[in-house]
Amino acid sequence: MPTWLTTIFSVVIILGIFAWIGLSIYQKIKQIRGKKKDKKEIERKESNK
């Protein structure tokens, strides 16, 4: 396996791990904020119809 291939492979894995961690943190923040905003957003959607 050429060195450039292993380098690309490791970079992709590292980026994937960072993206996965970032998404999990983002979803937790979204859930915390979502609990507060859910009621307001539902009321807005119903009033827009």
From Swiss-Prot:
GO cellular component terms, semicolon-separated: host cell membrane; membrane
Superkingdom, natural source: Viruses
Membrane topology (UniProt): Single-pass membrane protein
UniProt keyword annotation of Transmembrane present: yes
Annotated compartments: Host membrane
Keywords: Host membrane, Membrane, Transmembrane, Transmembrane helix
Spans through the membrane: 5-25
Keyword Transmembrane appears in the UniProt entry: yes
Record-stated family: Belongs to the plectrovirus ORF12 protein family.
Descriptive protein name: Uncharacterized protein ORF12
Organism: Spiroplasma virus SpV1-C74
